[in-house]
Amino acid sequence: RCSRDWSSDVCSSDLIDYGFPESEYYHPQRTGGTLMCHHAHTSDPDPLVGIGEKDITAHVNFTGIALAGQDAGWEVLGYTSQGRFLYNCGLGEALARTGQASTANELRDRSALQKLVAEHEMGELFKVVGFVKGEWFDAIGFAHGDRSHTL
């Protein structure tokens, strides 16, 4: 969300990715780092096997992202899980209003939404950090379950 008025610039930005705060990112038990490769519903840590056949990914250091944002003049609005963020933004109420899924498409859509918020799926794996530049505002996505203190 960005707007411009006569006196100041106000912008906010949310970053959604999978990762950890620094204390978890550099945890002593994470000796192999966070690099992972994915292919055909399997994963492994070796990007040199099956070159060109796998997606290569790594988790992000959300503490580093927050510090970089602050160095650039942004303030952290909040940090939470994707599931909590979506529920704070009203996803639970929206699902309740739709009632029971009655068609295959509705069931598929509801299942996809559940995957976004379920703790054992993307809901906890993915995190959201919000930034603001300019005038501070209360961001509803971080109203409950803010974990900024862990950054």
Region annotations inferred by a language model:
Residues 9-151:
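Rossmann-like AdoMet/SAM-dependent catalytic core
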